[in-house]
């Protein structure tokens, strides 16, 4: 079998009718985890419904419908394989909770595929002030998705079809915009494709002889290719943050007869091992880890990305809960957050947001109301430069630097130190009204409770 391929996560973004579903569906269909029987079933249904031209988008619609109805569809359907990687599509917009998912994200995307439609008039609509192309690209940038691929789709419907001039125009315009928000266009492959007909998806297209291929310059060197598949293979795999101190936000806490209290969550940074002395924030409780398990097997160490359960001594199920964060008591332990400063982008709020506004924040697994205590500055969301001090209010489309105060104990971190614990979604009226990135955290130096087991191991407190 040889070496297992590396896994990477991508998020597919772009305006509503840019052809995201068709393009994604095409990749899954051609390289992916959908078995022949399922495809034949979908094709038959499509013919019966007179949607013969459906092909790929139909596949995705079926998957989406099942996902939204809460049917646990085989997640393999959202995976596909390239010569170099196993790729998982962690989400695609169009979902009600897309933005929230992308932020509290069960996983961080390694690369965003921005799909833009090149058809006459379509591109302009997508990148206009109220199109989603800009919003999604900005969101990807804000949330720390460092790499991007631009798929210039619907090349078959340019005027004339497969127009080199149109591809040039779209490339220039998109480059200018993404440069403003902080991406380097030189490091981004721009691929002219037809997600529907398959041009330049997996094989070079005969319809665009003028396209000599894409070329990108990155610190890893120059890479070239012709197709979208090759562009995906040019993604630089992520470095797992094992060298950072441990942060593990709890998803749940169970009480298991004969074993005791078992917190469950995903290691975001660092390493968790049996015998380690961990501190839970914001509760400030310290105790020893007896054992660590994943998929019912004991682990000697859990690494970033691993979903694990671990057994802790002398801590009751009432002491800790979802949203608590486990950390290494001897290496930058997590603490309760008194106040934090964040750069916030208001996305869709019907009115003005001013000091005193107290919506719910979703940050890692925590879900807690926080008060916008002070609007410190309004910034240009494209350049990040300050445009006004102490603004009275912020409205949709604005970005600002804000001080927030949690209404209940909470533990968050700065985005630069611990990215998964430093980005959040602001929820109100059942939608995501804003997203934010934490710049600075004021931590409380509370006196904690150290369990007997941990005292023996020589942590805090006087030995009795």
Swiss-Prot record:
Q: List the disulfide bonds.
A: none
Q: Where in the cell is it found?
A: Cytoplasm
Keywords on record? Cytoplasm, Elongation factor, GTP-binding, Nucleotide-binding, Phosphoprotein, Protein biosynthesis
In the record, which positions carry 5-glutamyl glycerylphosphorylethanolamine?
A: 301, 374
Claim: Cytoplasm is one of the keywords in the record: yes
Q: Does the keyword Ubl conjugation apply?
A: no
Cellular component terms per the entry's GO annotation: cytoplasm
Q: Recall the GO molecular function terms of this protein's record.
A: GTP binding; GTPase activity; translation elongation factor activity
Residues bound to GTP are 14-21, 91-95, 153-156
What are the TM regions of this chain, as residue ranges? none
Report the family membership: Belongs to the TRAFAC class translation factor GTPase superfamily. Classic translation factor GTPase family. EF-Tu/EF-1A subfamily.
Q: Matching HAMAP family, A to Z?
A: EF_Tu_A
Q: What does this protein do?
A: This protein promotes the GTP-dependent binding of aminoacyl-tRNA to the A-site of ribosomes during protein biosynthesis.
Q: PANTHER family given for it?
A: TRANSLATION FACTOR (PTHR23115)
For this entry, the protein name equals Elongation factor 1-alpha
Q: Source species, please? A: Onchocerca volvulus
